[in-house]
């Protein structure tokens, strides 16, 4: 099943995921809220991790980089000499090359098969990727990211919470989503991250409160929706623990400890 899963994800992104129509990818059309009212909020959410990325460094790893499709994503490597992009999709790598040019290092390979040096990267990022890896291999991915990133340097992972208030409400009313899942998706509960506490310092932060699907339902595409997004962003910053534990997306910053 695990090999089939890799083929499934690879097939989607090599066949259609990064096809661009009207400057928008299939991936963005499927998984992002592209409406005008949400634009500023989503931009601020994407920029959140810049607070945790080192101000300078030589090498930053982008695991499952895609084509670096948003301007905010491009900003993550602005203070580094090289951005190392790993992705299953040849199209994604080719598009990333056009943006990074000689500043990029490119790997059209399976992440688990690439032999990176230990303690090589000054920072590693993985956005919306780990939960598309088989649930029994996600730990392996985090361990590898920690191994190849320097001691006390950040490994930043954007992940999803399976126990949101919306999901709890759905379970109460016995709601079942009949929409076919495009690619594999499995999220461990937040406490899953505690297993890494013996090898890394771990901190959690809110990323975005709602999936794009729910945003489109809850927030109207007008000035009222835009105002509501401002309130949500303020509350995420003010009451971070509540939003991490009860809403959709959060990110984890892991810093490998120096073990004696």
Where do the protein language model's features map onto the residues?
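A short, conserved alpha-helix within the catalytic core of class I
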Residues: 133-144
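Class I SAM-dependent methyltransferase SAM/SAH-binding core
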Residues: 66-113
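A conserved beta-strand element that flanks and buttresses the S-adenosyl-L-methionine
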Residues: 125
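A C-terminal cap/extension of S-adenosyl-L-methionine-dependent methyltransferases
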Residues: 174, 206-260
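Conserved class I S-adenosyl-L-methionine
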Residues: 1-53, 57-66, 156-178
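Short alpha-helix
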Residues: 183-200
């Amino acid at each position: 099943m695990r090999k089939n899963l890799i083929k499934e994800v690879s097939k989607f992104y090599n066949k259609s995921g990064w096809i661009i129509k009207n400057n928008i990818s299939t991936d963005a059309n499927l998984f992002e809220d592209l409406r005008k009212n949400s634009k500023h909020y989503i931009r601020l959410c994407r920029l959140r991790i810049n607070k945790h990325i080192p101000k300078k460094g030589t090498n930053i790893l982008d695991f499952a980089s895609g084509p670096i499709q948003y301007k905010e994503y491009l900003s993550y490597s602005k203070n580094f000499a090289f951005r190392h992009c790993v992705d299953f999709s040849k199209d994604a790598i080719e598009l990333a090359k056009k943006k990074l040019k000689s500043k990029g290092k490119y790997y059209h390979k399976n992440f688990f098969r690439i032999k990176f040096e230990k303690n090589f990267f000054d920072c590693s990022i993985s956005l919306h990727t780990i939960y598309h890896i088989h649930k029994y291999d996600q730990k392996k991915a985090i361990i590898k990211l920690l191994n190849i990133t320097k001691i006390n340097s950040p490994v930043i992972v954007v992940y999803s919470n399976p126990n949101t208030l919306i999901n709890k409400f759905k379970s109460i009313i016995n709601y079942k989503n009949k929409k076919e899942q495009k690619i594999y998706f499995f999220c461990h509960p937040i406490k899953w991250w505690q297993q890494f506490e013996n090898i890394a310092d771990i901190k959690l932060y809110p990323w975005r409160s709602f999936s794009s699907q729910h945003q489109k339902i809850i927030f109207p595409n007008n000035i009222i929706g835009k105002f509501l997004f401002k309130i949500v962003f303020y509350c995420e910053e003010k009451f971070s623990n509540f939003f991490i534990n009860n809403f959709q997306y959060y990110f984890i910053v892991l810093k490998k400890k120096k073990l004696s």
